Swiss-Prot record:
Predominant location: membrane
SUPFAM superfamilies xrefs: Ribosome recycling factor, RRF (SSF55194)
UniProt entry tagged with the keyword Membrane: yes
Disulfide bonds: none
Topology versus the membrane: Single-pass membrane protein
Coiled coil: 31-118
InterPro entries referenced in this protein's UniProt entry, alphabetically: Desiccation-related_membrane (IPR052928), RRF_sf (IPR036191), YtxH (IPR024623)
Record's keyword terms, sorted: Cell membrane, Coiled coil, Membrane, Transmembrane, Transmembrane helix
One Gene Ontology CC term in the entry: plasma membrane
Name recorded for this polypeptide: Uncharacterized membrane protein YhaH
Annotated compartments: Cell membrane
């Protein structure tokens, strides 16, 4: 926020100095000079208001985007957990079958080793 404020201050001061330098170096009557200064000031003031408005709109958009991304991340996380649980339930019978087959194979290997030792 401080850097944004310094930027605006720099723009403001630079605009005033630049505008004053241009106006004072241009050959004009006093009345024309005052009119040009007022026009330039009004233009500068409008630019500052627009910058402020754009900055606030950007801030609001960033806040909204952050909130939406947080919501999406929560939703995706919940869906992922549900998918993992469903997958685990689906593979449970296969996992049990594989464990039984592995146990059977281990038993057969033990029997073969026993037979070979005799």
């Amino acid at each position: 926020m401080a850097s944004g404020r310094s930027l605006l201050t720099g723009l403001f001061v630079g605009g005033i100095i630049g505008g004053a330098a241009v106006l004072l170096t241009a050959p004009s009557s006093g009345k024309q000079l005052r009119e040009k200064m007022k026009t330039n000031y009004d233009s500068f003031e409008e630019t500052i208001k627009r910058l402020k408005s754009d900055g606030l709109a950007l801030k609001d958009q960033l806040i909204k985007a952050a909130k939406e991304s947080t919501d999406v991340i929560k939703d995706v996380g919940g869906e992922l957990q549900t998918s993992i649980k469903k997958w685990q339930e689906e593979i449970k019978p296969h996992q049990q079958d594989l464990q039984k087959e592995i146990a059977d194979i281990e038993e057969k290997i033990r029997q073969l080793e026993k037979t070979l030792q005799n």
